[in-house]
From Swiss-Prot:
Binds 1 FAD per subunit. Disulfide bonds join C136-C141. The lineage of its organism: Bacteria, Pseudomonadati, Pseudomonadota, Gammaproteobacteria, Enterobacterales. Belongs to the class-I pyridine nucleotide-disulfide oxidoreductase family. A metal cation binds at C11, C14. It comes from Serratia marcescens. This is Mercuric reductase.
Amino acid sequence: MTHLKITGMTCDSCAAHVKEALEKVPGVQSAIVSYAKGAAQLALDPGTAPDALTAAVAGLGYKAMLADAPPTDNRTGLFDKVRGWMGAADKGSGAERPLQVAVIGSGGAAMAAALKAVEQGAQVTLIERGTIGGTCVNVGCVPSKIMIRAAHIAHLRRESPFDGGMPPTPPTILRERLLAQQQARVEELRHAKYEGILDGNSAITVRHGEARFKDDRDLSVSLNEGGERVVMFDRCLVATGASPAMPPIPGLKESPYWTSTEALVSDTIPERLAVIGSSVVALELAQAFARLGSQVTILARNTLFFRDDPSIGEAVTAAFRAEGIKVLEHTQASQVAHVNGEDPQVATVGYSEAEAHHDGIETDSRTLTLDNVPRALANFDTRGFIKLVIEEGSGRLIGVQVVAPEAGELIQTAVLAIRNRMTVQELADQLFPYLTMVEGLKLAAQTFTKDVKQLSCCAG
């Protein structure tokens, strides 16, 4: 058996990709890759080059070295071989023409693949039957975050924490104007990040139409402007995304229901809104509409965030109910009459305790409520917590769960800590700027060895 040390993996999915890459290297019989151990165990044919193994891992953006050998950066020429094993074109192969790549779709995955293919020397034809940009910029991340931001400002005006010094004022919501501002920014970003990039890249040809496979080397594209065009390819990526699934509830199809797509472009705020589901998208929109004036009821088949640490769902449910949002847990809609980012935010990385135990990893953990974070106190907003999960024995940080108004900003520091295989003590020993929310990570790390309630503001 040959053993590799691998750094840079952040989750089990990373390990799965590394395993797939290693098993494509000639001479590798099998590979067992563990994210938790940062290691791989391989069965090899005699004469298999160790450098080929480390290059395969490097091709995914991670670092690998033989467990019993010093590190080496001498990988000249191996990356091209890795690309070949992964099914990509070898720019140095001396081919008479560039690799022809067809990409069906124009969202984030399609764009990333098209640009990477061009970077490696390919010619790309990108086919889109609808609006360039896919879900995120048009009907997903961008408009939803703009709407959530508007709803957050409405909430701040309505719920001032400063009592008589800055009395709250019920906001006037002009949804039509908010929608116009939202869509203007959507169009701006779509042009800047998608249309403009495609127009400026001579190696990418865009066809507006619907594609179907003619055979294993040709696509037939029914152009939106009329007519058909055949697109020949050496490689084809189908990156068409997904669409909402409608639950089989009697009467739903006959009702004026929304998916997230319709909700984000509605020019009215409904008086009452029932949200069926408890996914991030459902909860983000539920809270946004509640803050903009709707009476919102969430129907959750289980609890909120039931796949995560239970304390996350409990904290978000309490926050929603405090805002007047009805949360009905363990409830399923049986019939319809015929007539996110949620706040506080939720951010997680790595293992939850349950996931670690499922994978056979013994853990220890600490949870720091935000009333122990000075910046949260200064903000008059102590909703939420920071939870750190470590590997028992080694003390290595393997998971972080955060519920906080700025959870999305905090989590990147946790990502870096896990990616660099830091121990909780190493995290506790870092210098963090005082009176910032991210300081909460240091304080949470300190709770493994100290009572942070007994520390002065800048001590530790």
